[in-house]
Amino acid sequence: MSRAAGVTLAASALVAAVLAVAAIPLDVLAHFAPVWLAAGLASVAAAAALRGAPLRRLSLACGALAIVAGGFLMAPELLRPPEPAAAPGAAGQIKLIQFNAYKRNGDVRRVADWLIAQDPDIVTLQEARHDLRDELLRRTGWSVAGAKEHVMIFSREPRLRMMRPPLRNSVLTYMNATYLGSAGPFEVVSTHFDWPTSRTFAQQHADLARVTAALPRERMIVTGDFNTTPWSDALRRTDLTLGLRRVDRALYSWPAQVGGRAWPLPVLPIDHVYVGKDWKVVSIERGPALGSDHYPVVVVLAPVWRR
């Protein structure tokens, strides 16, 4: 192996190690923990295979450090206990789809075809184009909350009400409505956060906690594109402050495409679903690529019946 190649490998491993270690105190880097972990694994594998490579020991050491740091960030999410599951035949189930449909996704009919075929009770959309809204309403009997916004909630049955909690100086983009389920009314809140580099990002997390605190939480469902990974301090704090349970666990939802071309492997779990104590999960899974840069998340919930 040439010296130049060995130096390049060592430099790549060093960069991965530095970024992985820096991600522990720097939350904006922590979101990319899977990237640092994968880079560390690749560096170690390459250095192990190329026994004569210059700076091989440095490559191995830096790669191992990136693996340890990335694993340290991701371990709490990967090792947390699974959600208590409801039986597949549990009564009163609802099916919900969470999806950032992507404002530049012109394949409206394909998205509508898939959503309608799923026969959901609730669909929460971010970056919802108005032609997609019109297509869904034309072909179904669904109702929509937030019809003029880019965050919309579609439902098989009309909503009972829409009580918007008053938020002063809020920077949160969200939609909420109340629906009637078999076990009683339930709240649905859907949101779309800015990127972690935005000045509004931290305030959006805090504002969402204010919304959930102002509404009944027992049968609440919160969904959205949070642009936040579960190995970040930002989402860990939100897990604690919402008063709900996040039912997705390392469910990778982004990217589905890059630069208009399909991307084979999602890297970051940034679409999330939270529920109140009176829901149990029947199933949760990632849907197919539909022309958006996000994959949909499909969750089936069953109510906990209280006497």
Report residues per predicted region.
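Structural signal for the C-terminal ends of transmembrane alpha-helices
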Residues: 21, 45-54, 159, 305
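Internal catalytic or translocation cores that form aromatic/hydrophobic pockets or channels
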Residues: 120
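N-terminal signal-anchor transmembrane helix
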Residues: 49, 58-113, 117, 134, ...
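Soluble catalytic domains of enzymes that build or remodel membrane lipids, polysaccharides, and related
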Residues: 96, 102-116, 124-307
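Membrane-embedded alpha-helical segments of integral membrane proteins
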Residues: 5-49
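N-terminal Sec-pathway targeting helices
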Residues: 1-7, 47-62, 227
